[in-house]
Curated annotation (Swiss-Prot):
One of its GO terms (molecular function) is aminopeptidase activity. Glycans are attached at residues 196, 288. One of its GO terms (biological process) is proteolysis. Monomer. CDD domains: M28_AAP. This is Probable leucine aminopeptidase 1. Residues 1-18 form the signal peptide. The keyword Metal-binding applies. It holds the Pfam family Peptidase_M28. It is an enzyme of class 3 (hydrolase). Zn(2+) 2 binds at residues 195, 234, 343. It comes from Trichophyton verrucosum (strain HKI 0517). The keyword Signal applies. InterPro entries: M28_fam, Peptidase_M28.
Amino acid sequence: MKLLSVLALSATATSVLGASIPVDTRAEKFLIELAPGETRWVTEEEKWELKRKGQDFFDITDEEVGFTAAVTQPAIAYPTSIRHADAVNAMIATLSKENMQRDLTKLSSFHNRYYKADFGKQSATWLQEQVQAAINTAGASRYGAKVVSFRHNWAQHSIVATIPGRSPEIVVVGAHQDSINQRSPMTGRAPGADDNGSGSVTILEALRGVLQDQTIVQGKAANTIEFHWYAGEEAGLLGSQAIFANYKQTGKKVKGMLNQDMTGYIKGMVDKGLKVSFGIITDNVNANLTKFVRMIISKYCSIPTIDTRCGYACSDHASANRNGYPSAMVAESPIDLLDPHLHTDSDTIDYLDFDHMIEHAKLIVGFVTELAK
């Protein structure tokens, strides 16, 4: 996640849109979109300079010729009442902070998870092995559950785990797996414990919880369930764009996508004397799906919500939205109180609260079950 409000806390932060950035005409260029219809060719270093100044964007260099961003989404009726409380509560009871701490300790031990680096490839391979182990342990592969690599033209692959249902319509939970040190993207130390190791291991633990339900494991849920771990989010939502563009091109139907980007930092709220809460993103999301998410939180989670905005192209839910799929995003806190260590070598596990991450996992289990089962 790379968010304007976090960097706005610095008095030295200035608007890049009005700045003149020198261009090295010999360098490889990338086409980025900073706002709807506002595009610019930049070098890779200019991309990172924009990020350092707090400007988010889509990297649309590899977008298909003639692609048009969706301006409307299909009208989808979401449940207005809770229907599977017993099943969800049984799954929630299996969620483990110890599992998440173990997984995040390992995931953040890679030197970095930069999408072009060997470390990014290695971390993705390790993460996919954990997903496969969860599927194997549940016996779900016998009923068609699987995990696959979604390959890109860079080192790190995205990961897609699928639990088939009676319908091909998909309920998606996603998180980006890559990390970055913005001062030295390729070689710098970037543990990325919160951004976004926290989201990655939170949805992994939620997957384990969901796989405790035999109706889901045996493919008897009404809808298909997918868990995604995206590559290259920090470079312009690259992995999620590729996946959702592919889904659009192949006619896949997505009932809803819930994004989890940073799930573990609460100190900003505590220091302000605020009640620890979820940050509900209200811009560039589907309002009806977000209303459904609020219902899930009120039923299955023990903390309240605060409305907040994160801007254009701030994280992977925006890729779903851009391709016409309804998406929602729940952050660890209001955007202006996010973890200040993101994108540095100080983004370590020491600053995270695993009870808060469990609340996110409870949300995911409830979201998936109530929407898919």
